[in-house]
Amino acid sequence: YSSAALFGGLDYEMASTKVRNIVSTDHNSGKFRNGQNGYHELPYTLNEVNNVNSLLKEKKIKTNLFVGENGTEKQFRALDGKAVSLIHIATHGDYKELKQREADDAMKHCFLIMSGANATEENNDGLLRADEISTLNLRGCRMVVLSACNTGQGTLGADGLFGLQRGFKNAGVQTILMTLSAVDDQASMLLMTKFYENIISGLSERQALIKAQQYLRENGYADSKYWAPFILLDAGKSPIPHPSKS
């Protein structure tokens, strides 16, 4: 990896009315990274990206950290066409499963929730949807890490699964680390920190994830709900080369 964009510790209080209407208003649930349990702060996502940032810098990897008010949809869109080899997003994620005949619309119903600094702008409402991601040029990005709930979910259509993973693959990303269910905020931070420790020690993405999951099981998070949701898509393949600039 040569450069990374890291999003976490996002300021959800800035989000638009549109976003607030989508997620629940029940703030008494546990700290899971989806909209189902309320639109609450995720304090460990800030720890997570700070840990990742420090680990990558140790390896002299150039990082851009987007936290608080700066973790907006507009900032993510600005990665369009940039040669960023790693993108990490720690936030709320969710999806609405549609019927198979509605699969063409499913990409509009799988999303990540970003900070709402530009919520008044039509195209930057705080919801980063799969259909929007699919229009970007993220070729050359070796891996996207989606540290949020349900980021590997979607609607099954005739041409496969329609969700965030399809959005990022259409954008040209090679490997995706995603989740198949809700994930715990603190456990996710621990897993991701260990995952990157393993990466910088020389392990492959797949080996790094297996070791990180094992670490959780052996350190107070034996229940599969804490570590099993995380899976890799297309790990170990070569990235699509980013077009050279003339």
Task: Explain the meaning of each model-derived region.
Residues 1-246:
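Catalytic cores of enzymes
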